[in-house]
């Protein structure tokens, strides 16, 4: 097929153009090129959760569904890179699948109901903001206090599997019961935690300046001008560093399979 002869090494501009083509015209070729370009990223993320076990192929398929969802939902008009939106979307689909497959204990109705609303709010706000929402934004969206949101997220964490490695190991011998225990402090939204989980190993490829630029732009949501002022460099320099850092992260993710 002609589509297979297309190069997979796409620039940021190529990616945005293909996403726009797919969203506007439902172009199958554009979608195939995007999937071909990002399939190694999906494989890398999937392996972090499957460790090559019996669920590996299923997790890859779920990750691909997450990628397709990210392609459909990404707002290219904002101009942010696609990867910081796609990674938590893919991870979220995989973790939801694993929770649904392995969560075999009773969860109080209030936690289940409000936990579901919080999860939906995070997804809606991520689509709207094109970044992970803060606790106060989730609370405002649901008409709750920050304390209530934190309470529900913390309570829900006490019912979640403590390690996804345990889930996969149990699944390999047919068991559906995973080890349950309390898991640490609540982050500012599930998606930030998931993004850090995926990026923690590959983030070390960046130097300190690159790490700072990525932190200010994607975690603190500063624009390039304000980021430059924080670091004492020009806006143009920030733009160059951001492109370089994202390129390094993509290469590290694609090679870590």
From Swiss-Prot:
GO terms for biological process: DNA-templated transcription initiation. It comes from the Bacteria. Keywords: DNA-binding, Sigma factor, Transcription, Transcription regulation. The keyword Transcription applies. Pfam families: Sigma70_r2, Sigma70_r3, Sigma70_r4. CDD domains: Sigma70_r4 (cd06171). A motif (Polymerase core binding) lies at residues 58-71. GO terms for molecular function: DNA binding; sigma factor activity. Sigma factors are initiation factors that promote the attachment of RNA polymerase to specific initiation sites and are then released. Belongs to the sigma-70 factor family. SigB subfamily. PANTHER family: RNA POLYMERASE SIGMA-E FACTOR (PTHR30385:SF4), SIGMA FACTOR F FLAGELLAR (PTHR30385). This is RNA polymerase sigma-B factor. It comes from Bacillus anthracis.
């Amino acid at each position: 097929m002609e589509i297979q002869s297309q190069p997979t090494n796409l620039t940021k501009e190529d990616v945005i153009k293909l996403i726009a083509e797919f969203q506007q015209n439902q172009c199958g070729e554009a979608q195939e090129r995007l999937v071909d370009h990002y399939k190694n990223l999906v494989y890398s993320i999937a392996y972090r959760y499957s460790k090559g076990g019996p669920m590996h192929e299923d997790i890859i398929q779920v990750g691909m569904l997450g990628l397709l969802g990210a392609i459909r939902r990404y707002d290219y008009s904002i101009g942010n890179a696609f990867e910081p939106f796609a990674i938590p979307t893919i991870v979220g689909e995989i973790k939801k699948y694993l929770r649904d497959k392995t969560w075999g204990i009773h969860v109080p109705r209030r936690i289940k109901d409000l936990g579901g609303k919080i999860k939906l709010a995070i997804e809606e706000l991520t689509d709207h903001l094109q970044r992970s929402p803060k606790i106060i934004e989730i609370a405002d969206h649901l008409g709750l206090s920050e304390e209530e949101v934190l309470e529900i997220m913390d309570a829900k964490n006490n019912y979640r599997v403590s390690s996804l490695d345990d889930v996969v190991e149990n699944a390999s011998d047919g068991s559906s019961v995973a080890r349950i225990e309390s898991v640490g402090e609540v982050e500012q939204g599930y998606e930030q935690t998931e993004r850090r989980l995926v990026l923690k190993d590959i983030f070390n490829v960046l130097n300190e300046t690159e790490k700072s630029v990525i932190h200010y732009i994607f975690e603190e949501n500063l624009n390039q001008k304000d980021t430059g002022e924080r670091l004492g460099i020009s806006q143009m320099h920030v733009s160059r560093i951001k492109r370089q850092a994202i390129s390094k992260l993509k290469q590290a993710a694609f090679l870590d399979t």
